[in-house]
Amino acid sequence: MRGGNPGLVLQPRDPSGVAEAVRWARTQPVPLSVRSGGHGISGRSTNHGGIIIDLRQLQSIEVIDPSTRRVRVEPGARWGEVAAALAPHGWALTSGDYGGVGVGGLATAGGIGFLGRSQGLTIDRLRAVEIVLADGSVVRASEAERPDLFWGVRGAGFMLGIVTAFEFEAGEVDDVGFAQLVHDVTSDVAGFLERWGAAVESSPRDTTSFLIMGPPRDGRIIAQTMNVVASDDSETILSRLQPLANTAPLIGQQAQILPYEALVVPPPAIHDAQGQPVSRSGLLDHITPEFAKQAAELLRSRATYFFQIRALGGATQDVPPDATAFAHRSAAFSVVALGATRTQLDREWDTLAHHFNGLYVSFETDRRPERLTDAYPPATLARLRELKHRYDPDHVFKDNFPLDR
């Protein structure tokens, strides 16, 4: 999403081209960025005056083993294209909430999507990668081959190399229930947040809910939820939606059964980034009364124009915290706020910081050093530093939350 003014954009067409680009770029005294879809909030996919390795030409999607639902996806593909390719098989992969996002960035950071509570994070569906390392070598990593590297790729891959192919195990998904619920929460913002959080946590794992709010408009605060039930049974869908609908007075609603691919249709053109987004991120175990109250104050302060909470839990918590570089497995919610100015958003957000037990790097633009330790617990960070020394000792890949030497 961040605009940039790079000096040179390289568009390799295959892994050997990516390797050649890395070997050349590392000899140049300018910043190096890697871009797949260019939609990333954190802004690591562009720079000013440097080199971008743009992966948009690597966009193939192929089924390599129907019996295990094994799918090979290149990083320049967009998630809406992946959904469309898998739909005829009755399969789907959880990703995010927008089909225009590129595979490469999301699938190396985490992936908090509409099927998250039933399928886990996107990285939890990953079975192997092909990756170009800082020295230009092309290697494979999986649980059986270079398992240390495979561990790091799942949550911090952008620090370790450029993934040129992902092998996922897709999930079996028929049509899904999708509902948009709109509430007027003006009179009780904090109470609504508590009730919605409790409803989400008590929902079966086939149900995932995303909440979007903004500052008051015409004196009203409106909350919109996007809710996905991984079922095509109408009675099941309605039973899952009712507790979410009961959290506050409804002023708008629609529900339908549709193919998963219809939720993440990609835009017709590649993303054209503009501006300098300012965002803050936090991971939350529960929406407590104290957090809800301070979040309501954040909204009324107008420091944020876009406030979103995504449901985690369910399958995302089945994975042990030390199994991947994304270690914050106790989190039930991902919280993100976008603001117009860094100073105002940081001031208000920092009052919430003590509620969080981590952050999601893809939603964070604050580059203060402590954000790195928020993103990765001490044991995880120590392990990542060891991997960095082994696979990228010269810190070729450093344009996002760089690990210190």
Predicted regions and their residues:
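Soluble FAD-dependent oxygen oxidases
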Residues: 1-405
